[in-house]
Amino acid sequence: MNFNKFLIIISCYLACVFALANQNDGGDDDSKTKKTTTWVWVTTTIGGQLATISTAYSQKFISTHSSEDAKSVASGEIGLGSLSGSVGGIKTYSQTTITNANIAPSNNNVFLGIESLYTGIVGGIVLILGLL
């Protein structure tokens, strides 16, 4: 009888872990955005003690314009006080490449097919402790 209760508790715990680990942050799979996660260190005060923890920081970048949008811009001049410029031209920017050297591990690492396993385990433990 105790073994059955143990199996039920473990099954519920694992279900919570899987549910918490795969939340997809509400993003669409077919969107044109790309999610990039960076691990950052955050220093805070907890209970009067200084604590430094790592946490995931992510940004999403989307395309801000297309070539078709640029064709519809009318030519002309624009100014603000002593500042002036032209409208309708396509401005090019130099490209900066950022490398991945010496970065913290990202959540792209998959353990047994489960992303963010650590987050799911911690969330499951908090959930179980909350039920007690």
Curated annotation (Swiss-Prot):
UniProt entry tagged with the keyword Thylakoid: no
UniProt keyword terms in alphabetical order: Cell membrane, Cell wall biogenesis/degradation, Glycoprotein, GPI-anchor, Lipoprotein, Membrane, Signal, Transmembrane, Transmembrane helix, Virulence
Cell compartment(s), UniProt: Cell membrane
GO cellular component: plasma membrane; side of membrane
Leader sequence residues: 1-19
Residues where lipid is bound covalently (GPI-anchor amidated asparagine): N100
Protein task: Plays a role in cell wall stability and rigidity. Required for normal adhesion to host cells and for adherence during biofilm formation. Necessary for proper oxidative stress response.
Record's protein name: Predicted GPI-anchored protein 1
